[in-house]
Amino acid sequence: MESIRISIIQTDIVWENKQENLRLLHEKLQSLRGITEMVVLPEMFSTGFSMQSKMLAEPNSGATITTLKQWAAQFQLAICGSYIATENDQFYNRAFFLTPEGEEFYYDKRHLFRMGREAEHFSAGDKRLIIPYRGWNICLLVCYDLRFPVWSRNVNNEYDLLIYVAN
């Protein structure tokens, strides 16, 4: 198992402004060129923790993920975070893990934050995800999932690294 240099990016997210948030992220990625091998972004990094799912959702083939896949290849690093996704007429707080080799992995947040009314605007996921990356098995979860430790229990040492993307 090789080591992985990880950078955790926390920014002042511009509320519901995908283009500006992507522009700001691009600046940060340029400054990290050659310094890191994985970048962890906040939950809903491109919009803020918005409940405007119908207005802001994109499919996995949308502009946000397409742009991030290009940057993962360009900057030779893995990128993970979450965004507002749509699939089969449902909306998800979807975590993504994109590799420089073009692999893409997705996890839909299981435990929605009821006090923030997230469950009124998003569907919950029902599958945990273990990502194989550079000899590591990575479990990727989202924010409020942290409050439910049974969901992240490492039975039979399934994963080596647990990442929670949070806001």
Predicted regions and their residues:
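Extreme N-terminal starter segment of soluble prokaryotic enzymes
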Residues: 2-8
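Cys-nucleophile CN-hydrolase/nitrilase-fold catalytic domain and related Cys-dependent amidase chemistry
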Residues: 18-19, 26-100, 105
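Short, solvent-exposed loop/turn segments at secondary-structure boundaries
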Residues: 17-21, 118-119
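Generic enzyme active-site microenvironment
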Residues: 8, 41, 143
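Short polar catalytic/cofactor-binding loops
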Residues: 10-15
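Short acidic, glycine-rich surface-loop motifs adjacent to enzyme active sites
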Residues: 3, 37-46, 158-167
